């Protein structure tokens, strides 16, 4: 076999050198890409760990808030039950006091006429009893004979019981 010509050897050497440079360049790029991927993976892992920690903390905060809200709910429900019991007691008291209130309203409505009656009775007491007189001759302006619409029973009762003014209140 004969040796390849020098030009072919130089071309082959140049080609091999170019392939070697290209391989070295690709290996350098591959190393850089691997470092980049490794750095990104570490950052993603760290970020994932931070997110998991934040998520865990959010879960704990949520659980604490739920516990606090449940406690507030129980306190509020106890307050509502207490207030309902108070309302029931007051409703019962109102129910018991209602007849008395109606009676007091009735008394208040009747007070002015009653006050007038008491004033008239006081005036009658101030005037005092009539002087003794002859039953056959009544005093002028005094009681006269029974009226037509009077019954004999009323006349008998008037003669049996003399009128005495006074208050028993």
Curated annotation (Swiss-Prot):
It comes from the Eukaryota. Keywords: Coiled coil, Cytoplasm. Residues 126-135 have a biased composition (Low complexity). This is Vimentin-type intermediate filament-associated coiled-coil protein. Residues 126-169 are annotated as: Disordered. The keyword Nucleus does not apply. Residues 136-146 have a biased composition (Pro residues). GO terms for cellular component: cytoplasm; type III intermediate filament. Residues 7-89 form a coiled coil. Disulfide bonds: none annotated. It is found in: Cytoplasm. It comes from Homo sapiens.
